[in-house]
């Protein structure tokens, strides 16, 4: 069993682009363009993989995003 996970961001109607972009930049360490692309994908498809890595690295990021009210889920990469 692998500990590699993807952190998925789900689209919602409660948060605007600026708010989500700021969260992705702060907690996922995205640059402006990467955050913007993730937001557009999540908006158009309903979700977007915003980060991947070891579960122990992903859990704190997920917790911070959820504290900010964003909908996320960790999924296995296989």
Regions found by a protein language model. Give the residues of each.
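Terminal domain-initiation and capping elements
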Residues: 1-78
């Amino acid at each position: 069993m692998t500990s590699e996970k993807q952190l998925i961001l789900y689209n919602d109607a409660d948060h605007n682009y600026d708010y989500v972009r700021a969260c992705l930049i702060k907690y996922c360490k995205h640059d402006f363009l990467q955050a913007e692309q993730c937001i557009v994908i999540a908006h158009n498809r309903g979700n977007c993989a915003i980060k991947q890595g070891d579960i122990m690295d992903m859990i704190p990021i997920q917790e911070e995003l959820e504290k900010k009210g964003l909908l996320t889920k960790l999924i296995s990469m296989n």
